[in-house]
Amino acid sequence: MSRILSNCLKSVWRSLVLAVSIFVFSCLLTYPALAGIDDDKYDGNVFVLYAGNGSLVPARISLADSLKVKKPALIVFYVDDSSDCKKYSTVISQLQAYYGKAASFIPVTVDSLELNGKYPNTDPGYYYKGAVPQTVIVDKDGKVRLDEIGQLSFEKIDDTLRQVFDLLPRKE
């Protein structure tokens, strides 16, 4: 009888140790994400998380369609795991507040572009230079008015868009 009781206690003890071990191991595997705006770790779409603007992605209109209806387009090439792109997303979101109805905003994650792809000039991939963030402004006639890599200021892009729309210069 004592032998049966001893075996039963050992079995319960082993099951308890196994259950605790699985619990501790699963807690270690599911620790919260450590990504933030100042690092290059992926934690979701930059426009949704850092700009607070999920309406930018996915783009509502293609570049080809925007040019067909003679609407200027602002193309932004980005990746979700770049601190520069995370910080820059707020600038693009602010611009959309002012120009969202007059211009097409086309954010393009470079992960979606084909490597060595041949693109027509009506496809955003045609303008990609290989670095992010990259901002391209194409006017209603398809002419490139701005094509720069890096984080641009709101004012720089605003100045270009004011020229595209023939608006008065911004007052400082």
Where are these regions (language model features)?
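N-terminal secretory signal peptides that target proteins for export/translocation
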Residues: M1-S11
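Bacterial N-terminal signal peptides
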Residues: S15-L28
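N-terminal "domain-start" segment that seeds a small globular fold
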Residues: T30-S62
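Typically the conserved alpha-helix immediately C-terminal to a functionally engaged Cys/Sec
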Residues: I61, D84-Y99
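Short active-site neighborhood of thiol/selenol oxidoreductases, capturing the structured segment around
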Residues: S66-D81
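Extracellular/periplasmic catalytic domains that process cell-envelope and extracellular macromolecules
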Residues: L67-V69, G100, Y127-A131
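Thioredoxin-like thiol-disulfide oxidoreductase module
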Residues: S93, S104-P133, I137-D141, F154, ...
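Thiol-/selenol-based redox modules, centered on thioredoxin-like
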Residues: D147-E172
